[in-house]
Amino acid sequence: METKYNFVKQQIKSKILEGIVLPHGKIGSENELMKEYNVSRHTVRKAIDELVNEGWVYRKQGAGTFCADRTDQKNPIGKAQRKNIALITTYLSEYIFPSIIRGAESILSEHGYQVTIFSTNNNHEQEKRALEAVLSQRFDGLIVEPTKSSIPNPNINYYLNLERQGIPYVMINAYYEELEPYFLGMDDVKGGYTQTKHLLDLGHEQIVGLFKNDDLQGAKRLKGFIKAHRERGIALNPQHIITYTTEQKNAKPLEELHRIFKDRSHRPTGIVCYNDELALKLLDVIREFDIRVPEELSVVGYDDSFLSVASEVKLTTIQHPKVEMGIDAAKLIISCIEQERKDRSADGEQSIIYEPKLVVRHSTAEAKSEKGVAK
């Protein structure tokens, strides 16, 4: 159980790291802190004493306690010797992330940088803890994959504080629009469009799309899905668009597909999946209904991960750059650090957008007519 003084200490540190209390800004008085955190004077003093000893705050006789300017504590020589990069991803050992990490580490280690890796599990609180660690330990730069990038983020102040402290960052796979950061990611609108167009070209008209909508990638892939239908003049069945959040990803898509397949009279002939991971899970549901892939149902994944060839049905999918993205992100953050660039405009020359490429395997085929022949 966390002690009261440590709780107060961590709360004050969080305000400093978030940029709520700026360097040389006054920390609340003892009485104010006692009231705010409902603790004793002894607890407040113990918390402040430790913060003073650790260089977070300083006292002025008769004036109070103030936030220390930690940028003043940075030794330029020491900074050159540190060469530490933080890498924050939503996941570490799952799916495409080991390949991205491997690509980044190969370049960073080649240039003498040490890499510390954090995972958020696509959770804002865990992202906050990772950013606090980055700001506390004074990394030279940060490569970060945003957390739940399509919804308002409570941690934007931490990124602004990184900028204030001169710590550059680049974002991969998605970005926070309000920050306009350097960004490396796929053209996900075109990716979703390409998935859908492939099925439409094969004669499929009843297509289900499943997209994770708390990440920007999912929102953009859905946009591409809708765009492809509009271009063909094919009206979408609203019940064939299934969206879900990170917390729902293991249940809702499967439950919704069960619901759709139970209605034999309006079964779809094609499915567009947010990623390969989802596609593989859906194959289990499809087997339950004795539906054959691709003879009766075509399925398209996204990312061309190792999972795309892990099943007996090899997935048609969209290729994700993975290792290449990691390499490019590492080169960009090194360039930002060594040239001390300040401009982080998202539409500047430093952002990299990768073109989606369709990898056709065995999970898609021409749609069959009611008589069982190709259209």
UniProtKB/Swiss-Prot annotation:
InterPro entries: AraR_ligand_bind_dom, LacI/GalR-like_sensor, Peripla_BP_I, Tscrpt_reg_HTH_GntR, WH-like_DNA-bd_sf, WH_DNA-bd_sf. Residues 30-49 bind DNA. Residues 1-70 form the HTH gntR-type domain. Keywords: Cytoplasm, DNA-binding, Repressor, Transcription, Transcription regulation. It is found in: Cytoplasm. Pfam families: GntR, Peripla_BP_3. Gene3D superfamilies: 3.40.50.2300, Winged helix-like DNA-binding domain superfamily/Winged helix DNA-binding domain (1.10.10.10). PROSITE patterns: HTH_GNTR. One of its GO terms (cellular component) is cytoplasm. The keyword Transcription regulation applies. GO terms for molecular function: DNA-binding transcription factor activity; transcription cis-regulatory region binding. Transcriptional repressor of the arabinose utilization genes. PANTHER family: ARABINOSE METABOLISM TRANSCRIPTIONAL REPRESSOR, LACI-RELATED TRANSCRIPTIONAL REPRESSOR. This is Arabinose metabolism transcriptional repressor. It comes from Halalkalibacterium halodurans (strain ATCC BAA-125 / DSM 18197 / FERM 7344 / JCM 9153 / C-125) (Bacillus halodurans). The gene is araR.
